[in-house]
Regions:
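Short secondary-structure boundary/capping segments
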Residues: 1, 41-42, 120-123
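Active-site substrate-recognition segment that forms the wall
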Residues: 3, 7-65, 77, 81-86
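Conserved flavin/dinucleotide-binding core of flavoenzymes
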Residues: 46-166
């Protein structure tokens, strides 16, 4: 399975996030209306809040000539959508007026359909190619912790390979 998204990353001022959801998933009908899949909130240690708006892709082709306009247009569309979407949470709605955009990016991801990819497939010593991510089976599968753990596991495998080569 593969997906392409436009993500708008926002930095919000200090917000009490105790009563806020960590993720807000939109229904299929709302996704169609707003062009957004979900909102992800990232509380920071200093009480600021990161907010990532996962916008849906419209299929527009990106070229060096079209990229600046596409970035501008998607950032504007996602900013308009998020202001409507956070209305039920007054703390978020109020903080959004002081939000600082960290930019918008288009990204794609491929994911296993039913389970994590076997960790045995993470490193190919013959080709000297390895990869890591949250879609590798194991502790933290499907979460940021899984991506970090798979990176540590890959680093260990590369180190062992390097030692064995010498």
């Amino acid at each position: 399975d593969a997906s392409v998204r436009w993500n708008l990353m926002l930095e919000l001022p200090k917000v009490s996030s105790n009563h806020l959801p960590r993720q807000i998933w939109l229904t299929a009908q709302a996704q169609e209306r707003f062009g957004v899949e979900r909102l992800v909130l990232h509380p920071q240690q200093d009480q600021r809040l990161g907010l990532v708006v996962h916008g849906l892709d419209d299929g527009a082709v990106i070229t060096p000539d079209s990229q600046p306009e596409l970035l501008r247009r998607h950032e504007q569309q996602l900013m308009e959508a998020v202001s409507d979407l956070v209305q039920p949470w007054s703390a978020l709605s109020n903080a959004l007026a002081q939000a600082r955009s960290l930019g918008v990016m288009r990204w794609g991801a491929a994911q296993p359909l039913h389970q994590g990819l076997s960790a045995d497939l993470q490193w190919c010593s013959e080709a000297r190619v390895g990869f890591c991510g949250d879609w590798i089976a194991g502790q933290g599968f499907g979460m940021a912790e899984g991506a970090l753990q798979s990176a540590l596991n890959l680093a260990e495998r590369i180190a062992c390979f390097s030692v064995a080569e010498t």
